[in-house]
Amino acid sequence: LCGTAICSFGIYNVHDQSGITEGGALGLVLLLNHWFDIPSSLATPIIDIVCYVLAFRALGRKFLEVSAISTLSMAMFFRIWEHFPPVLPSLEDKPLLAALLGALFIGVGVGIVVKNGGSCGGDDALALFIHKVSGWRLSRAYLISDLTVLALSLTYIPFKKIFFSLITVTISSYILE
């Protein structure tokens, strides 16, 4: 629960407020929120379920059980944060700081969950699956999904902010490992 609280806090209070996006499933949640006004608390479990179905066979039942708890708690924490205004000042005019702070929250939060045998989002399940079947480093598997979503994010986020998102996803992928 601690990892999902940290991660969701950072996404809501840093990324959602500053326009810095995340890659993978987290970035896809932000895309859906922007494109269709779908709340993060709804989009998160839907995307996660799809990714978990893909990863179930390679990662096993225990991973799925821990991840189910993490996914539900991630949605729960998003729901809690959505009931309050952001507690951090807007970092929209300080994108490098937003990228670094977001990377710290996400990397630490996801790292706690992954080290305890689960994932706090579908991109974790997908990256762990890719890592297991390909032998790639976990950070590389994360970057592949992140870069795909960041490319899609160019539809609503200027390249300058995508640049800062690249900083976030690169740093967070190495922090979690």
For the regions a language model picked out, list residue spans one by one.
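Core subunits and conserved enzymes of cellular information-processing
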Residues: 1-177
